[in-house]
Regions:
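P-loop NTP-binding core
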Residues: 1-276
């Protein structure tokens, strides 16, 4: 499966639905028959707890151990400690130990590529790798962007995101310049959209005004819902918890948009190979 696509779900602002999006996109892709690996790249471990592993401190193997082994060039079984969720996604979990690794990375050789080097050992087994980034633009997030083919940016509809987005786009530009020239922005996903669609419209307009039409905004928008907040305590996706809810339908629609991107990429790749 060398056609594996790695997507970083990224926004340095917290509370925009990054983890919820990673879970529901991941499970949505798995429901469509794709093999999916989720990476919790946040020391808070929200993705890990969202999927039902509450006591993150008791996990003996997390992303920290995987990356430490790469840094120290120790032999490792790269699949050891990968957790298997009942909704058919795999997870490299995280806990607070990841924040201490951030300091180690600063002095490591090829420090921006440690996560990329780890993923090269496992990604042939998967169609998609989704990285849930922490809400900051430090070295771990830089690693995620270096390892990724593309970025999905969840943005809260009630929040005019001009300033934060400028920072994030600046970081993406830096990554492109130094460590990952091919990094693409797949699009912006509007989340927590309430019934007042005018507010969502004004956010879309502000995004277009500030960032031009070159950044795509997904047609699917994720509605705000109390139920969606409840799901994170259940250890399941929205599909398992409330399959007919507006949030579930919105994430299913978003998953189809992401799959359509993947199919287009495959067609372009095939055409390129044929032309050679």
């Amino acid at each position: 499966m060398s056609n594996c696509k790695t997507i970083a779900v990224c926004n340095q602002k917290g509370g925009v639905g990054k983890t919820t999006t990673t879970v529901n996109l991941g499970v949505g892709l798995a429901m469509q028959g794709k093999k999916v690996l989720l990476i919790d790249a946040d020391p808070q471990g929200d993705l890990t707890t969202c999927l039902g592993w509450r006591d993150t401190d008791s996990l003996s193997v997390t992303l920290t151990e995987k990356l430490r082994a790469i840094i120290s060039e120790q032999e490792q079984n790269p699949f050891d400690g990968i957790l298997h969720h009942k909704e058919k996604v795999d997870l490299v979990p995280s806990n607070l130990s990841l924040s201490s690794l951030e300091m180690t990375l600063v002095t490591a050789m090829s420090r921006e590529s440690v996560l990329k080097n780890y993923l090269s050992l496992v990604k042939d087994k998967y169609d998609y790798v989704l990285i849930d980034c922490m809400p900051s633009l430090g070295m771990i997030t830089f690693n995620a962007l270096t390892a990724a083919n593309s970025v999905i940016i969840p943005v809260q509809a009630q929040y005019l995101p001009a300033k934060g987005m400028t920072q994030l786009l600046g970081t993406i530009a830096k990554v492109r310049k130094h460590t990952n020239a091919d990094l693409k922005i797949d699009g912006i996903l509007l989340t927590l959209v309430d019934g007042r669609t005018n507010l969502a419209k004004s956010t879309v307009e502000a995004l277009r005004e500030n960032f031009g039409s070159h950044i795509r905004i997904y047609r699917s928008m994720i509605p705000a819902a109390v139920k969606a907040a409840e799901v994170s305590s259940k250890g399941t996706s929205i599909y398992a918890y409330e399959p007919n809810s507006p949030v579930s339908k919105a994430y299913a629609s978003f998953t189809k948009e992401v799959l359509a991107d993947g199919r287009q990429k495959e067609r372009l790749h095939a055409a390129h190979e044929h032309a050679r």
